């Protein structure tokens, strides 16, 4: 996620910053399908002595959504939903980038005493 350096905002007028902020907010679009985290795939061995996984063919891969807070709360993602989850994660990364830039603009507006 790349947020413009504050020096880039110093060159812009307050009106330009406000217009940029409005444009960024409008570009967020539909945020109902946003996920934050990552998608990981794992393979498993069941431990049964006569299973194919003991011969080097593990079960899976199984997809899991891992929230930002770490391994805790991993959610299984059925194979049919993996493309949907990938799209939602991409939308989440896009939204985070936009929100970071909006926040940086708001910091500059606050420094100018023009936030509002």
What are these regions (language model features)?
Residues 1-116:
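A positively charged, amphipathic N-terminal helix/segment that binds anionic biomolecules
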